[in-house]
Amino acid sequence: MSRRKTIEKRPVTPDPRFNSVLVAKFTNGLMERGKKSLAQRIFYDAMDLVADRMKDEEPLTVFEEAMEKVRPRVEVKSRRVGGATYQVPMEIRQARRNALAIRWIISYAKSRSGKCMSEKLASEVMDAFNNRGAAVKKRDDTHRMAEANKAFAHYRW
């Protein structure tokens, strides 16, 4: 048995505008070089653009539904068995689902062509909300890989 103490997770304080922990985690993922106020401004500008373009929807619900549509349920992990490496499908815990969805939305928003980051982020969130976009495609590819390797699910540990 390990003698190390389990580290308590630090609570994430909700963001000031939407009072949401998910938004706070997203802005933390968006932040570069410790510039949190800039990351928050980019996110809030993106949500204002979402509110302008989708008048019938609340921007926070659009963001939350987009996150839900990007979150993967299963992924494959490499496992060595007798000299061969198998891609074993595994279920993902909730915290990792959120982290992957945040990472994918931000990275594919950055790789989009556009003027500023808030516009790129807004269009990526709206595409994810409508089940389009690169982040949703990445989730589908991850699920397809897990489905293709379902035969190796008994190697799960």
Swiss-Prot record:
Gene3D superfamilies xrefs: Ribosomal protein S7 domain
Alphabetized Pfam families for the sequence: Ribosomal_S7
SUPFAM superfamilies with a match to the protein in the record: Ribosomal protein S7
InterPro entries reported in the protein's UniProt record: Ribosomal_uS7, Ribosomal_uS7_bac/org-type, Ribosomal_uS7_CS, Ribosomal_uS7_dom, Ribosomal_uS7_dom_sf
GO molecular function: rRNA binding; structural constituent of ribosome; tRNA binding
One Gene Ontology biological process: translation
Protein keywords: Ribonucleoprotein, Ribosomal protein, RNA-binding, rRNA-binding, tRNA-binding
CDD domains: uS7_Bacteria
Any one annotated GO CC term: small ribosomal subunit
Top-rank taxon: Bacteria
Job description of the protein: One of the primary rRNA binding proteins, it binds directly to 16S rRNA where it nucleates assembly of the head domain of the 30S subunit. Is located at the subunit interface close to the decoding center, probably blocks exit of the E-site tRNA.
Subunit record text: Part of the 30S ribosomal subunit. Contacts proteins S9 and S11.
Assigned protein family: Belongs to the universal ribosomal protein uS7 family.
Matching PANTHER family: RIBOSOMAL PROTEIN S7 (PTHR11205)
Protein name, per record: Small ribosomal subunit protein uS7
Naturally occurring in which organism (per UniProt): Desulfotalea psychrophila (strain LSv54 / DSM 12343)
Gene coding for it: rpsG
